[in-house]
């Protein structure tokens, strides 16, 4: 039986894509998947990081893990894919500060047409914040996104071995959905007839949120089981945005509050503040829905 707390501590280490820790975490994930009877495909890719990020290489290389359970019968693809990115990143500013900068930028541009001097002051603050949007490797990424990795293992451990559920551990999400975009471009046939449930940042505190990219029955059932608030747009960048175009339905599940956003991408996003209650509650709700399929 898996000790999820031990697994969590193994995974929640700084693991910027391309670093030795990043490779170490990938091997741990492969180990855990194969121990559960999954066949693991490694999809290597290269892509350009998001232009909004500073201090990044011109090209990012990564490896997506695509896992399906071995079967002795006819090959039938998963009807549901559970997805979570396994890379992490640090930044000089938290997600909360970055959101403040984003809204300040919008407010500044709108105010330009009303009051020039206040608009310039707001834009100056926004540009100072944006200038701190650099990538580092100093965050353990416990909430973002080791909690989701553990939640996927918790979920599949509550399902039968015959459940038609696949797993994708995507890479280089923190560089601008590079791995997810590669999956959509090169492996779209895997997801065409399936529901895709992306997990991202599952804190112990706060309420669950369902970021609905493409509506569907399973995604709706998951949102209901978690009593999640449902939104069609949120000011966050998640893999579901890139993958929703190639699957039958797609939702991203997040869990947290303002305090969560204050620690994401910072050194404080560590195992010391996470009990895995959020991951366990999301996994339990997911498993209930998937067992009924």
Question: Where are the regions a protein language model picked out?
Answer:
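Short beta-strand element of the alpha/beta-hydrolase
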Residues: 78-85
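Extracytoplasmic/secreted proteins, especially bacterial periplasmic and envelope-associated proteins
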Residues: 3-6, 24, 28, 179-182, ...
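Active-site-adjacent substrate-binding region
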Residues: 44, 194-195, 202-293
